Structure formats: C-alpha cells, structure tokens
Amino acid sequence: MKQPFSRLFGFGDKQDQEMETGKQEEVHQLPIKEIVPNRFQPRTIFDDERIEELAQTIRTHGIIQPIVVRQREGKYEIIAGERRFRAVTLLGWETIPAIIKEFNDSQTASVALIENLQREGLTAVEEAVAYQKLIELHGLTQESLAQRLGKGQSTIANKLRLLHLSEPVQQAIMERKISERHARALLSLKDDALETKLLEEIVEQHLNVKQTEERVKELLEDAPASKPKKKPTRKAYSKDMRIAMNTIRQSVDMVMKSGLKVDTAEEEHEDFYQFTIRIPKKK
C-alpha cells in the first residue's frame, strides 16, 4: 500500500496511528483575528478570483475540511488551509473551524510545502523553491526527493535549475508573464544582463519559445569571445598529483554542467599547486 506523504517525510507516525485507531481529532472554532499565515508558504501569489469563487462555495456549503494550525507566540499559525482562511476572511466571518497540531518548524514547513505540491497552480519557480526547501529540511538528494514525491529525478533537476536565473526572470515566471519553457531557454545565457534584456523582448514582442531559443542562439554568437586563459607552464608532477588535479577539474566541470555558475583559478607555487573555487551564494 502506498505510504502517505507525511510518513515518507518522517513525521506522520503519530497522526497515522490516530487515524488507524479511529481517534477523532478535536475541531476548534478559532477567532480569525488570532490566526496568522504560514511563514513557510511556497505560494507567493494568490488568485483573487479563485479565492472569491471559494468564498462563494463556502458561503453556500460551509467549510467541509477544517484548516490545520499550531500555536506559536500567542497566535495560531496556519499549517494547511490558507486559501480557506483567506476565503473566510473575505466573507467577514469571525471564526473558522481548525485542528490544532503540535508541530515544530520542520514539520510545519514540510506539510505546507507538500500540501501545495499536491495541488495545481504553483508556478515553476514556487515549485522549485518548495523542492529546494524540502531538500534542505530533510537532508535529501534530488534523487531521494524524487522517489518520495513519485516524480522523475530529471523533473526535480530541471525545476531546480530555474533558481539559477536572475531575479527579474524568476519574478516574470511567478507573474506568469513567461512560460517555464521560455525560462529554460534563457538558462543557456548564464548572464543576468542578457537574461533581463531578452526577457524584455519576450514580453514586449510576445516571442514564442522557438523565437526565444533563436534569440538566445544569436546573443551567444554575438557575445565577444572570452580570451583564452594563458596556461601556466607546468612542471613534471607525480602520478598521484596529476590524478588529484584532474579529479578536481572534472568535478568542477560536472558542477558547471549542472547549471551552477562557478569561478575557478589555478596558481602554481614553489611548494604547492593552488585551486581557488568560488561559488556564489545567490541562487
């Protein structure tokens, strides 16, 4: 039998046991003014029209599923159900049915991320941010995260690569001004200024994906060729030394092929050979 997401991420045993024994969780009517949004909410843009539609449904049928919250700093922080909370707020209700959980930050973030990943409507960047946070929270690799979510590893990797794009491009994706395929074409530029320049063209001229790919090719061809670095004259090194140096170079090449921007430099000294690798903190 397929395991629930909560158990796959290591915090669902207690809740699953309660469900199996038929134990009903108590539903509380909490004051709207005492409830605050989830700090770990991956969804940054809410569709006002859809919230209004949900509000009308709730007005007619009521709330079928209570929201889930936890107590934090004298308030109730939403774990799951922010759209319902927004809809009820729009209706002007004073209370909302809720289940109170004892979750820590890691559990709260995981539930919020997973709940949103299971729903449609997240932008590609919001989805990528959710994947990245789950990887960081649970110390996962891309492959292990893909297995837990039932997705292909390439799907996870392609989404995460979008986080290497410049801020204006990521914002354009979240505002749905460009598609994910447009954004993936821009990845080849590996230059914030060029990405922003082409982003403006895409939006203003309504370029499709094929046209965008052609413009990327043109920009790369027009870019001034970088001057080849002067290779230092190397002394004869031992076999072990050569293996170590080549291993480092191959590792750097693999990282760069994944889409991460890495600056490297090699310096030869009298008593040692120095590799300097700089990886920008900005994702």
UniProtKB/Swiss-Prot annotation:
- Which terms does the record give in the GO molecular function aspect? DNA binding
Question: Which is one Gene Ontology cellular component term of this protein?
Answer: chromosome
Query: Would the keyword Nucleotidyltransferase turn up in this protein's UniProt record?
Result: no
What Pfam families does this protein's entry cite? HTH_ParB, ParBc
Chain's role:
Effects nucleoid occlusion by binding relatively nonspecifically to DNA and preventing the assembly of the division machinery in the vicinity of the nucleoid, especially under conditions that disturb the cell cycle. It helps to coordinate cell division and chromosome segregation by preventing the formation of the Z ring through the nucleoid, which would cause chromosome breakage.
Question: What organism, scientifically named, is this protein from?
Answer: Halalkalibacterium halodurans (strain ATCC BAA-125 / DSM 18197 / FERM 7344 / JCM 9153 / C-125) (Bacillus halodurans)
Q: Which residues cross the membrane?
A: none
Name under which the protein is recorded: Nucleoid occlusion protein
Q: Where in the cell is it found?
A: Cytoplasm, Nucleoid
Gene, per the UniProt record: noc
Q: Domain of life here?
A: Bacteria
Q: Where does the record place the region Disordered?
A: 1-26
What's the family? Belongs to the ParB family.
Residue stretches in coiled coil:
none
Q: Which GO terms describe its biological process?
A: chromosome segregation; division septum assembly; positive regulation of sporulation resulting in formation of a cellular spore
Where are the disulfide bridges? none
User: Bias regions of kind Basic and acidic residues — which residues?
Assistant: 13-26
Question: What does the record give as the DNA-binding region?
Answer: 143-162
- Keyword Cell division among record annotations: yes
